[in-house]
Amino acid sequence: VVDACFEVLGAQTERYALPLRQLLAYVSAHEWRKKGVLIAALNSNIHPHYGVFSPISGEYLELIKSASLPNPCASAWDIGTGTGVISAVLAKRGLKTILATDTDPRALACAQENFERLGITEQVQLHQADLFPKTDTKADLIVCNPPWLPAKAAAPIERAIFDEKSQMLKGFLLNVSTHLSAYGQAWLIMSDFAEHLGLRTPNEIPDLIERAGLRVLKKYDVRPKHSKVLDTADALHTARALETTSLWCLVLDT
């Protein structure tokens, strides 16, 4: 319990009290951080920290592992890196120059720890930035996996799940073209779960892609396999049973 609280709150010089539910959340996060989550696409574990989205459902990572890379592909950016898992998959594919960004100090610390465990710190650089790094250099591949639900987060820990008014999704799509090399690709990972809940229209993402001056080169789809898909008692079962996660490979529409 002491370790769990220290990881979230840091060193405290005074006594304090916590709601039991909050304490249990800290302890649960500590256990996940300690044992890690096995990522099939890496054949290794990723260790999430408290408040950083845990890649428990890793089907989308298999898409990143197998999708055709741009040619050439000398550099890649991972926008909103979180645990760093996407950067790790790209590094495993052989990319030597990867730049990973996030706004959250917890996520940056988490990603750094995972990169050190995986021995890829020479391949990946971390930058604290809102979406794109401040650099004049363009990238051959820019990957983003924004939160999938366009709703307001009630707590900081929910920011990895909810993207209020689709701000991150829109910010990525409408600005990524200025950061791509001439033959580069932008990869968007997005579930249609929000569509099945009536929170997003089926045309919203294609319309954003067109507005951004991009076109779809290829689209890879995968159906989730996590246990909630089979749980008929789940209030969201119907939407989960229909859900598809897609990797949109986008290029400049020239």
Predicted features along the sequence, with ranges:
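N-terminal auxiliary segments of SAM/dcSAM-dependent transferases
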Residues: V1-V37
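Conserved SAM-binding loop and adjacent beta-strand
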Residues: A29-E31, H49-K65
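Conserved SAM/SAH cofactor-binding pocket of Class I
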Residues: S57-C144, P150-A154
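Short "lid" loop at the C-terminus of a central beta-strand within the Rossmann-like core
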Residues: W148-L149, S166, S191-E195
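Glycine-rich S-adenosyl-L-methionine
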Residues: P156-S181
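Conserved beta-strand signature within the Rossmann-like core of class I S-adenosyl-L-methionine
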Residues: Y183-S191
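Conserved class I S-adenosyl-L-methionine
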Residues: A194-E204
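Class I S-adenosyl-L-methionine
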Residues: I205-L252
